């Protein structure tokens, strides 16, 4: 494992530090500043009863994370990558469509509008108020402008806050989520990093928090250039358990919801394989023996996500910094993907 010098922090990580330093403040401002547009989207959702969430990269992970939250309110929500929607489209008629793109300029966003023209129930979610997406569709616009650093950090937190505004307009109580944003968790990640010191691959997994697991896997692989991927808890159980062992790190997300016991069972099984297991835990349950557990305030939904996310971000950054000298500076990708 490559360790970077203590007196030098890669430029790319310095850029991420700047984004993260203001992400919670920007998230609260985003919630406060988008109430009226959120009400318009909520009205559309009540009328259609369906929600098609479209995005790419970290935006798709956000969509996957909020998908169950809308379903819990009786809205038939489905998150699909824009690339899949372009090639094998679901009907947009009779559905509210919400397209998420932090830059508002990705290639798939431009092509989707060029080919479909959108609909009267098509909305956007972006960090850039002058972007193509913001000019083309009514948008929720996050505070703070475009995220400049590679790997999504602030853009995730702000996007979740914009969804909190929509969920609040649908009748959900945002108080706990906002309270967590105002006082972010500061868990020590040292034990988790030590547990993963010798892993060659990481798999992240959750049940209701699967979208958060997918966001972490993406960030881990972008920054560390180590193979990191995500499997929903049931999918991990059905066959891929065969890959687990001392060289495969497992990260699980457990919230205070009806799926918590299933995540617990997976933690027990993963420990039995000899794999190092880190659990981000907002369930209020006892830690599973043999795991490295980071405990958070008992919560579910966006409150759980807001609790865990900044700590998970610090974990992925430190994991990457220990492995590559220029973590945070992409060598094969760009911040805004303008090609398909």
Language-model segments: which ranges?
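Glycine-rich phosphate-binding loops that contact phosphosugars or nucleotide phosphates
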Residues: 46-188, 241, 246-298, 306
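Hydrophobic side chains within alpha-helical segments
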Residues: 111, 222, 235, 315-317
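Phosphate-moiety recognition in structured ligand-binding domains
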Residues: 2-16, 137, 269-340
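Active-site phosphate/pyrophosphate-binding segments
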Residues: 12-49, 139-249, 259-260, 323-340
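A broad, structural surface signal
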Residues: 18, 22-25, 32, 64, ...
